[in-house]
């Protein structure tokens, strides 16, 4: 969802006074729910009966945009009541970055010619923390499992080397608590104490807020990588 944010901003700029209902997975909704144009959010159930019920209960829209090309989203689109419906076609937009693919999709749908701007995520108002030292975030998780994951000892080595210049925050989802704990143990062995291990203990909005305050972020190919690119 993060890589669709420039395209979403072009939709916002196209429709005067637009109000947006965001529909999607729990993670995508958590990331987008603080958008200033959001008036409603709906987390989708994967069951087709639930998709049908959701579509029928949402009411009418002037336009419906789907940035997914799965059969489920086509099913949802069919039953959504909207004057205009647009669906991303992954077979049409190829050989370019995902951000540009989504932006080209919106350009074609609205017959406009815009270039994608910076990724954008909106946060709730957060209290300003007093930061004593620059912050380094490390995120050992990666999309598609261990094949794209760097070793815990390598993360720990880098974090240890940089700990004199940065305070360290370890990030990770519930499924990455073990690897985060391995990194924490290695940091303790190296005498590093200026760290926090937040793996498995952040909501999506919390994660976005923490990442927005980092000075340096080291991660594999992951969702938090795309979040960091927005700041």
Task: Give a label for each model feature.
Residues 1-231:
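Catalytic machinery of carbohydrate-active enzymes
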């Amino acid at each position: 969802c993060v890589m669709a944010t420039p395209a979403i901003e072009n939709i916002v700029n196209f429709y005067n006074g637009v109000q947006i209902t965001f529909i999607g997975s729990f993670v995508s909704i958590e990331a987008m729910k603080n958008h200033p144009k959001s008036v409603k959010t709906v987390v989708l159930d994967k069951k087709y009966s639930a998709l049908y019920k959701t579509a029928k209960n949402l009411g009418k829209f002037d336009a419906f945009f789907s940035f997914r090309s799965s059969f489920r989203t086509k099913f949802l689109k069919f039953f959504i009541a909207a004057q205009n419906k647009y669906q991303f076609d992954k077979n049409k937009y190829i050989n370019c970055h995902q951000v540009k693919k989504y932006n080209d999709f919106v350009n074609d749908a609205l017959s406009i010619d815009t270039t994608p701007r910076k990724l954008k995520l909106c946060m709730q108002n957060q209290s300003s923390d007093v930061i004593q030292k620059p912050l380094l975030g490390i995120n050992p998780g990666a999309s598609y499992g261990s094949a794209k994951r760097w070793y815990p000892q390598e993360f720990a080595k880098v974090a240890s080397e940089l700990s004199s210049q940065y305070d360290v925050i370890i990030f990770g989802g519930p499924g990455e608590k073990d690897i985060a704990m391995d990194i924490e143990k290695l940091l303790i062995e190296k005498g590093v104490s200026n760290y926090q291990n937040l793996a498995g203990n952040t909501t999506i909005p919390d994660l976005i807020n923490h990442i927005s305050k980092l000075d340096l972020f080291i991660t594999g190919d992951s969702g938090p990588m795309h979040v960091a690119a927005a700041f």
